[in-house]
Amino acid sequence: MGHSRRPAGGEKKSRGFGRSKAAADVGDGRQTGGKPQVKKATFESTKKKEIGVSDLTLLSKISNEAINDNLKLRFEHDEIYTYIGHVLVSVNPFQDLGIYTDNVLQSYRGKNRLEVPPHVFAVAESAYYNMKSYKDNQCVIISGESGAGKTEAAKRIMQYIASVSGGTDSSIQHTKEMVLATNPLLESFGNAKTLRNNNSSRFGKYLELEFNTNGEPVGANITNYLLEKSRVVGQITNERNFHIFYQFTKAAPQKYRDLFGIQQPQSYLYTSRSKCYDVPGVDDSAEFRDTLNAMNVIGMTEGEQDDVFRMLAAILWIGNVQFAEDDSGNAVITDQSVVDYVAYLLEVDAAQVNKAFTIRVMETARGGRRGSVYEVPLNTVQALAVRDALAKAIYFNLFDWIVQRVNASLTARGEVANSIGILDIYGFEIFEKNSFEQLCINYVNEKLQQIFIQLTLKAEQDEYAREQIQWTPIKYFDNKVVCSLIEDKRPPGVFAALNDACATAHADSSAADNTFVGRLNFLSQNPNFENRQGQFIVKHYAGDVSYAVAGMTDKNKDQLLKDLLNLVGTSGNQFVHTLFPEQVNQDDKRRPPTASDKIKASANDLVATLMKAQPSYIRTIKPNDNKAPKEYNVGNVLHQIKYLGLQENVRIRRAGFAYRQTFDKFVERFYLLSPKTSYAGDYTWTGDAESGARQILKDTSIPAEEYQMGITKVFVKTPETLFALEAMRDRYWHNMAIRIQRAWRNYLRYRTECAIRIQRFWRRTTGGLEFIKLRDQGHQLLNGRKERRRMSLLGSRRFLGDYIGVGNKGGPGEMVRNGAGISGSEDILFSCRGEVLVSKFGRSSKPAPRILVLTNRHVYIIAQNLVNNQLVISSERTIPIGAIKAVSASNLKDDWFSIVVGSPQEPDPLVNCVFKTEFFTHLNNTLHGQLNLKIADHIEYNKKPGKLATVKVVKDPAVARDDSYKSGTIHTGPGEPANSVSKPTPRPKQVSARPVTKGKLLRPGGPGGGPSKLAARPTPAAQPLPRATPQPAAPQPAARAVPQPVAAVAASHTRTGSTASVRAPPPPPPAAAPAPKKPTAKVLYDFNSQQSNELSIKAGEIVQIVSKEGNGWWLCMNMTTSAQGWTPEAYLEEQVAPTPKPAPPPPPPAAPRSTPAPATNGAAAAAKAKPAPPAPPAKRPNMAARKAVPTPPPAPRDSAVSMNSHDSSGGSGRGTPNSMSNASLAGGLAEALRARQHAMQGKQDDDDDW
C-alpha cells in the first residue's frame, strides 16, 4: 500500500476513500487508467519522508502501546491524522497547522485515500463520492471526549462538501452559504468555555445535508440533542456561560443597550459567577459580528433578531433578581426595580412576576374532584430555584426556536435524492462531580459506541460467517450490556429507577433522591454497576464514572411550574407565546415525560437515523488536558486508545476485507471491464450474476488471493484492488470518449484540409492580382518608349512597393521612418535603396547611397551618415508630391532618372533605382495619372537651381550588367525591346498528391475516397550507410552524438554477402579544413620607392597582396618586415593557390603512392631572361588619405537588401567601394561611409564647372 507524503510547507493533501453498501470501505478508485502511467523519474526535493505509518494496519506489532507510539511520533511532526483502514484517527493539535486552506482542499478533489496523506477532507470526499456514485445516504460519526476536536472536524467536513458539491444556480449557492452560516450561529448559542475546551459543544447536533440527483445541495435539516441548560444559571470557576451572553454584553449596539439595558458581563450574576469573562485568543466582539452576519444569511428579520436579544436580556436580568428572608423565613425580593425591568422585557405584569417568584399555588384534590387552592410562600432556596427554572426554560426554548428557524430557512428547494449526515455531539465526560447531565451525555456516547461496534466489528464478523468466508474471529468488548443497564425497563435500568422515584415521591426532592437510591439496590447484581453511599458507579466503555444522586430526581422531572407557565401565558409579547406554545391543562393527571424519557427517545431516534445511512468514522483524541500545542500526555492518550477500541479495530481490519458487494450490484458496476459481459456499453452476459462476477474478476486479472466469493456477495480484500477496478471502469469511458473525439477531430481535420486546399487553389489562381495589375500599369506608363531589363520581365515579378518595410512596426524600416521623421499618418507606397548623384566643391560628381521613400504626400531621399561613430539617419531631401513637375528618364535600359522640381534653392535629384518602373507607377497613381514622364536619349535635370543640364546615356555592349556613371555620361548595356511585356506567371512545381487525412476512422482520400495510396506504398528496405568521402570542410564545432536513423541502425546489424566474412573498416574522419590563405604575388622586377607611401621590392620576393586598385597599383605587405606600401601592378605576378587533391578512398589502399613532378622555378627563369621592367603608372593612391579595404567580388543587384547587407551601395553595385563587411547596422554603414570619404580624396572633378 503506497502512501504519498505531505509537501513541504505544512500543507497536507488527502484523498477520498469510499465504502460499500455493507458498511465496508468502498474506494472511489479515481485514477488515470487501468494501466499505470509511467513517468520519467525525477528527484523530488520537496517530498517529505513519511513519519511513522499513515495507516495503523501497517504496524509490524499490533498493541495499544505501538499505536500510541506511532500517534505520538506523528503528532510531534504535525501529522495529526492517521488511518485504520477507512476509519480516521485525529489528534487535536491545539494550533493552526495551515492544513485547511483552499489549495489543500482542492488537492483532495477526485483523489482516493491511497494517493495523498490522511486528512479529514478525505472522509468528506469519500462520503460525497459514494453518495453520488452509489446513491446511498451517508453519515459521518465523530466521536471522542470533550476537547478532542469533534466540532472542528464537523466544520471542516461542511467546508469541503460546500466547496466541491458544485452548482452554479443562485439558490444552490445560497443554500451553501446558509449551511456554513449555521456554524457560527449555533456555536454562539450552544458552545461554551470549559476547563478542557475553550469551544466545547454543550449540545448535540446532527446536521443532515440534502442533495439532488446531481449531487448539488438543495437543503439541510438540523436535529439538536441535550442542550446543557443548567449552564445558563451557574458555572464552575474558570468556565463561562454560553458564548452569546459575552458577545452580546461586550459588543451589543447602542440600540440594544438603550432598549434592553445591556451592560458589561460583570454586571450580571449569570455571567460573573465564575469570574471568567474572556477566552484566550477569542475576540467576542468579532464573534458577535459573525453571529449577526449568520442571522442575516439564514434570513432572520430584524424583528426576529430583536425578539431573540430581548429574551437574552430578560435572562440576564432574571439572574439579577435577589431574595432575602422576612421575619417569617419567607423569601422577599430585595430590589423591586429589577423585577419591574424583567416584567418590561417579558411584557407581563410586575406583580405577577413578584408572585410567581415568591409564592407557589398548590391545589388539593379529593375523589378525582378539584379541591382547595392554597398559596404557599417560598423560602429563599425555593425562590432561587424558581427564578433559575424560568431562565433555563426561556433559554432552552429559545435555542429550540433558533434551530427550527434555521431548519425553516434550509428547507429543501427541490427534490431530495440523498443526504450526508454529520454528527457532532459532546463526547464522553468524567468530572470530579458527575450528575444527571453527565449520565445522559455518557449514555448517548455508549449508544454511538454500540453503533460503531455493530457496524465495524460485530456486523463484519457476522457477515463473514453468514457468507461462509474464511475468517479468524477476533474477540472484542460489546457494550450493549452497559446500554441495557441504563435504558432497559425490564429488568429496570437506571432511567426506569429514576422515573419510578420521581413518580413515587414527587413532592419532596430529598425523599425522591432517597427512593432512587433504594431502587438502585436492585441493580447491584449487574457486573457493570456499583451502588455506594449517595452515589453509584457505571462501568462505561470509556472508564468507570461515579454519579452523585443528589438533585437527580429534580433534574429528571424537567417540568416548569404551572405558576411560571401561567406567568408567560399572560405576556403581551407574541414571541414569548411562540417560545411557550403549550397551554396549561389543569385537569391533566398523566405523568409528563421526564428528561430521561426524552433523551432515551432522542438517542434511539438518532441510532435509527444513523443505521439507515452508510457511516464513516472519525475518532478524535485529546493529547492533553491543558489545551497546549506540542504537549502529548502518553497516559491520557493510551487510556483513550483503549476505550475507543482502536486495537481491536486494527486487528479486524488486518484480517478482513476492504469491500464487499452483492453479485448483481458488482456486475452492474463493473460489467464494462470484461469483453464477455459487455459489448459497446451493453450488458451481454447470459449467465447468472455470480458467474458474471467471476468472469469480470478473471478478465481483469485480479489474483485469486485478492478476493473471495460468498453466498450472495463478492469480497475484495484490499482497497488497492477496488481502486484498480474503479480506475479501469473510468478508463473505459475515457477510451470511449477518446474514440468519439478522434473521429470528430478527424472529420474536422478533413473538412479543414479541404477548405485549405480550395483556398490554396483560389489564391494561386487569383493571388497577387493587384500586384500584377500594378505591374501592367507600369508597362502602359512606359508605352514602349524604354528598353527593359530582362529581370524586370520575369513572370514572378510583382510590384510589392515597400521593400524596406518602412511602413512596418519594428525592424530597420521603423528606424528609417523615425530617423527621417516621416509622419505616422502618411501611407508608405514605395521604399527602396538606390543612389543619388552628389556634387561637392572641388570634386567630381559621384553616386552616393540613399534610401528612396514615396508616400501619399512626399518623396523622401534619406541619407545615412556617421557622426561620432554613431549612425545618424536623416531626411536629406523632402519633396512634396505636388511640387514634382516631371520625371526624366532615358530610352535605354539604365536605371537612372531625375525628379524635376525646378526649386530655386536646390538642384533636382538624379536618382539611380533598380525599381524605377515601379516608382513611376506608384508616383503616377498618387498624382491621379498626371505624371509627366519624359523619355528621351538623354536625361534632363537642374544640376543647379535654374541651370538645366543633360546627362548622356550611351549603349555600351562592354557593360555586362550594371550601369556606370562617369563625367556626365551613363554607360549601360543593351536591353530587351521597348515593347516587351512581362512573361506569364510560371506554374508552380508539381507535387505528388497528398491524402486529405490520415488515420483509420476516415480513409485518406476523404469520407468517400478510394483506397489509401499510403497503405499500398511499399516500405523501403533498410540500406547500409554509404561510405563517407573525405573532403575539405569548414571548421566545425565540437562533435556531439547524433542519433542514427532506425533503418541505418537496422542495416548495420544485417549480414549481407559482401560483409559476412570481412568486416568493413570504419570510414576515416573528414580532413581538417585548411586555413584560408591570403593572396600573394611574386615580384618580377625591382622597384625602388619614390614616395613614403610606396614599397620597395626586389625581383623574386613574395609579397602579400592587401588590396588591389583598378588604376594599376596594388597595396602590398613585405612578409618579412611587415612594411606596407603601394607597388605597380605590372611588377607583380599573383600566385594562384593550387587546388587540393581529394583525399584517397578508404582502405584497402592497393595503389602505390605516386611521386609528384618537380616544380619549375619560375623566378629563376625570369631572372635569367632579365626583361626590361615596365614604367609604373602615373597616378598613385594617396596612402595617407586612404585606408586599405579588401575588395570582394561584385554583388548582385538588390535594392531591398537589409541594413546589415555587405553591399554598401544599397544594392546598385556601382560607384561606391564595397566596405560593409561588419555584421552590425552601425558598423557596416559607418565603414562604408568612411571608405567612400577616403576614395573621394585626391580626385579631380573632371566635369565640375565651379
UniProtKB/Swiss-Prot annotation:
One of its GO terms (cellular component) is plasma membrane raft. ATP binds at G144, E145, S146, G147, A148, G149, K150, T151. Residues 1036-1051, 1152-1170, 1223-1232 have a biased composition (Low complexity). Residues 1201-1222 have a biased composition (Polar residues). GO terms for molecular function: actin filament binding; Arp2/3 complex binding; ATP binding; hydrolase activity; microfilament motor activity. One of its GO terms (biological process) is endocytosis. Signal peptide: none annotated. Residues 1-43, 962-1079, 1126-1250 are annotated as: Disordered. Keywords: Actin-binding, ATP-binding, Cytoplasm, Cytoskeleton, Hydrolase, Motor protein, Myosin, Nucleotide-binding, Phosphoprotein, Repeat, SH3 domain. Residues 734-754, 755-780 form the IQ domain. Residues 51-730 form the Myosin motor domain. Residues 419-501 are annotated as: Actin-binding. This is Myosin-1. It comes from Neosartorya fischeri (strain ATCC 1020 / DSM 3700 / CBS 544.65 / FGSC A1164 / JCM 1740 / NRRL 181 / WB 181). The gene is myoA.
